[in-house]
UniProtKB/Swiss-Prot annotation:
<comment type="similarity">
    <text>Belongs to the bacterial ribosomal protein bS16 family.</text>
</comment>
<dbReference type="Pfam" id="PF00886">
    <property type="entry name" value="Ribosomal_S16"/>
</dbReference>
<keyword id="KW-0687">Ribonucleoprotein</keyword>
<dbReference type="InterPro" id="IPR023803">
    <property type="entry name" value="Ribosomal_bS16_dom_sf"/>
</dbReference>
<dbReference type="GO" id="GO:0006412">
    <property type="term" value="P:translation"/>
</dbReference>
<dbReference type="InterPro" id="IPR000307">
    <property type="entry name" value="Ribosomal_bS16"/>
</dbReference>
<dbReference type="GO" id="GO:0003735">
    <property type="term" value="F:structural constituent of ribosome"/>
</dbReference>
<dbReference type="GO" id="GO:0015935">
    <property type="term" value="C:small ribosomal subunit"/>
</dbReference>
<protein>
    <recommendedName>
        <fullName>Small ribosomal subunit protein bS16</fullName>
    </recommendedName>
</protein>
<dbReference type="GO" id="GO:0005737">
    <property type="term" value="C:cytoplasm"/>
</dbReference>
<keyword id="KW-0689">Ribosomal protein</keyword>
Amino acid sequence: MSVKIRMRRMGAKRKPFYRIVVADSRAPRDGRFIEEVGYYNPVSQPKELKLDEDKIFEWLKKGAQPSDTVRSFLSSAGLMAKLHDEKYNK
């Protein structure tokens, strides 16, 4: 089972709201997921992003692969650098 960290679209038409979830890669975008680890609201000013860093870090250590967009969010939050440091600077 390949696990991905990706965004799940919520909200109304033309008013998107995304939940960042851990899901099986074979599940549909808005389908079944394992755990919710954050959210992103692109409509609000300023854009709102909340990440549960502890949960995300645990899933990344277990081998979950983030989508490209989620990877950019994690990089801006400093989680990818933290994971890299822990993995290679033992």
